[in-house]
Amino acid sequence: MTTAHAAAPADAAPSASAARTQVARIALVGDRSPHVKSHARIPLLLDALASRDGLVLDAYWIPTSDAAAEAAAGTLARFDAVWVLPGSPYASEAGALAAIRVAREEGIPFLGTCGGFQHTLLEYARTVCGLAGVAHAENDPGAPDLLIAPLACSLVGHEGVVRAEPGSLAETALGAERSTEHYHCTYGPAPRHLPALTAHGLRLSGHDEEGQVRIAELPGHPFFLATLFQPELQGDGTRPHPIVRALAVAAVAHAAARAAGVAAE
């Protein structure tokens, strides 16, 4: 686990007026690489969140090869947010899934983008829906039952419109029902398994103009959102995407609530 950003000292008082200055710890789960554009954006986004919005995140990179052990040790559960980043195929599918499960079960604000979206659906299908045999084609191309399959048309370098369902977390986070987003992926969910996901409580709350799923969320969770597109690639990194900012807001709120709970003990 490596530090990605040194946060400035902040007042730890948990009151509503001080929540903005509460430092939140965020786990960046992924196999950090200088060749992955979204990874290079992270320091810029963290700086912009702190300077523009007063949202201070103390970020730590956790390689997927370490994530399962960090989850088992309870380390991940002590973070205020978990972001499973692009960069698949991951070194450890199990590690990525373990990080997602901890965030989902522990009520920790969560964002999964691109590969993080794909593995969010995979974790939910296996753990919640009981579809233990479903696979990701990038990790296991010969598997007989693919939940995540090659897209008919690659979305590498693609930009397209996404529509969020009214009243969804996706719409709230985006601040609009319609948004133009950036992609860099070649895999997406197989339609035949989507009914099982929704039957077990996952909400598929954003679609492209052809009706293909692009956003998933979990009702009842404080903040659990996954997008096939990469919000971190919007602009030049100096103005965080609304979804990235929404994650930061949720993380700071989680940190403030945790601090209040500790103070009350």
Pin down the residues of each PLM region.
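An anion-binding catalytic pocket shared by soluble metabolic enzymes
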Residues: 183
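N-terminal beta1-alpha1 cap of cysteine-dependent amidohydrolase-like domains
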Residues: 1-177, 186-215, 219-220, 228-265
